[in-house]
């Protein structure tokens, strides 16, 4: 189930908020702490035909309650007499509100600013206290900026327990916990009704969970592939993969996450039965460190942007260079299987992304040269890759067929370390592999000057298709 929180300040508007939430949610959390005046709780509970979870939170637990603690307890006792399906009680006061009627009890442990205990024993103690407080469900709210912060509870919910667990992780990996919680049997996950109504920054909306993450299709058997990042480009790719996997009848989904360092990542992935990790396009050094071996095309130290668990070994793959060059070669056209053969290709950049493209263009038989904002670094890359180096002072006298822009920090201009826009001229074909899905200033400039352009959307689609093919063995 999806639980949507409503936080009305007016009794008059409370029913409208409940009605709006009932159209998309399976369970509605009615937060009484935001109301200015005492409500008729029974009237509100009967306002919609969806289950209601009543809560009234103190400021220390993220709520807006300004009255006394005794007044809050009295309001919770009144609420339980109205017999909503659920009531949320803080762990430290749950024993002061006795069970009543058919209302089930969510006993909540909240730590807004401190992570959960590092040991399982500390988590077990909370469960024991919740059980003594007559809990039907245990709820945890805590900071989850990374997988490591979410780990104490994730390691617990991935195993069978007597009490069901729900969680509201504050931070990016709260989404990670929610999707894994669905797999491991959490009764519900929390979502905002729409943008601007999030309980915390980054909380997914109902639309996000349905359209991007397809959460209703996640089952115990679902295989997760982790994705490094929560930015818009990563989440768009998550949505594309999940839609294609769903259409193909594949029980696999992408799982956005973030981690602090590599020291425990493989152990955590193994426990959570996560089958792979999609890194940053163009190679992720952290994934390269974890790869026990690489696909043959990458050689011993080629850039890794996909890590897959193959027969117990973590194997590294490179997808961006292949996908970007497929898009480039499609734009070049012709009947040759290697359209780059004997064409002069200039790669501009000196970092990992540039190294990836030099690697790929060389394999596709292009006549590759390297230039960059720093001549020394460009010369080192050229020497390491056994290709030609073009000093900045000679760049504008260099005739090339294809220009691959592979510098995320590329600046257009006449200054030192900048790319003068006048260099971009027809009949050059321009590919910017740092563009993502959007036009960059360099792409816009190249297009305005009459150059051919490999459209960013085309490259993005090709990368998504390459990842889908590498992970599933099927075409998208």
Predicted regions and their residues:
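Active-site beta->alpha loop and helix N-cap motifs at the rims of alpha/beta catalytic domains
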Residues: 1-122, 135, 142
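Glycine-rich adenosine-cofactor-binding loop
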Residues: 169, 224-231, 316-321, 328, ...
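Catalytic alpha/beta core domains of metabolic enzymes, predominantly
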Residues: 92-224
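Adenosine-phosphate binding glycine-rich loop
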Residues: 332-336, 427-429, 433-476
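Rossmann-fold NAD(P) dinucleotide-binding segment
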Residues: 44, 286, 410-430
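Phosphate/diphosphate ligand-binding glycine-rich loop within oxidoreductases
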Residues: 222-332, 437, 443-445, 449
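Glycine/small-residue-rich loop that forms an oxyanion/phosphate-binding "nest" at active or ligand-binding sites
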Residues: 52-96, 286-335
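Short acidic low-complexity segments
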Residues: 386-400
């Amino acid at each position: 189930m999806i639980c949507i929180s409503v936080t009305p300040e007016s009794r008059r508007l409370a029913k409208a908020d409940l009605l709006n939430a009932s159209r998309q949610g399976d369970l509605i959390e009615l937060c009484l702490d935001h109301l200015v005046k005492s409500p008729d709780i029974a009237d509100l509970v009967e306002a919609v035909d969806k289950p209601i979870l009543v809560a009234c939170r103190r400021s220390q637990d993220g709520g807006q309650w300004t009255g006394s603690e005794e007044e809050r307890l009295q309001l919770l006792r009144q609420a339980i007499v109205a017999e909503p399906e659920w009531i949320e009680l803080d762990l430290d006061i749950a024993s002061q509100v006795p069970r009543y009627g058919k209302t089930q009890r969510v006993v909540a442990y909240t730590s807004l600013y401190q992570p959960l205990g590092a040991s399982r024993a500390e988590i077990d103690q909370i469960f024991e206290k919740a059980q003594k407080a007559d809990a039907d469900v245990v709820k945890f709210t805590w900071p989850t900026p990374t997988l490591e912060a979410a780990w104490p509870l994730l390691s617990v919910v991935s195993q069978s327990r007597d009490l069901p667990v729900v969680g509201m992780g504050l931070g990016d990996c709260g989404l990670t916990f929610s999707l894994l919680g669905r797999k491991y049997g959490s009764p519900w996950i929390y979502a905002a009704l729409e943008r601007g109504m999030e309980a915390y920054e980054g909380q997914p909306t109902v639309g996000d969970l349905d359209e991007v993450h397809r959460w209703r299709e996640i089952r115990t058997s679902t295989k997760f592939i982790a994705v490094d990042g929560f930015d818009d480009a990563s989440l768009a790719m998550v949505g594309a993969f999940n839609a294609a996997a769903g259409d193909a009848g594949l029980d696999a989904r992408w799982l956005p996450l973030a981690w602090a360092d590599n020291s425990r990542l493989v152990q955590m992935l193994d426990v959570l039965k996560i089958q792979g990790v999609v890194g940053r396009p163009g190679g992720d050094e952290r994934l390269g460190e974890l790869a026990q071996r690489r696909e043959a095309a990458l050689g011993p130290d080629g850039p890794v942007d996909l890590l897959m668990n193959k027969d117990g070994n973590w194997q590294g793959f490179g997808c961006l260079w292949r996908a970007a060059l497929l898009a480039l070669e499609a734009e070049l056209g012709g009947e040759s299987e290697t359209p780059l053969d004997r064409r002069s290709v200039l790669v501009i950049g000196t970092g990992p992304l540039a190294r990836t493209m030099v690697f790929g263009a060389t394999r596709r038989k292009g006549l590759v040269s390297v230039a960059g904002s720093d001549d020394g670094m460009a010369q080192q890359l050229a020497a390491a890759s056994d290709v030609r180096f073009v000093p900045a002072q000679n760049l504008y006298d260099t005739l090339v067929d294809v220009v691959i822009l592979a510098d995320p920090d590329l600046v257009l201009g006449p200054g030192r370390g900048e790319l003068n826009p006048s260099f971009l001229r027809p009949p050059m074909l321009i590919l910017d592999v740092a563009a993502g899905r959007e036009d960059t200033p360099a792409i816009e400039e190249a297009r305005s000057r009459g150059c051919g352009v490999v459209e960013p959307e085309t490259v993005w689609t090709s990368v998504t298709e390459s990842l889908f093919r590498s992970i599933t063995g099927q075409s998208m």
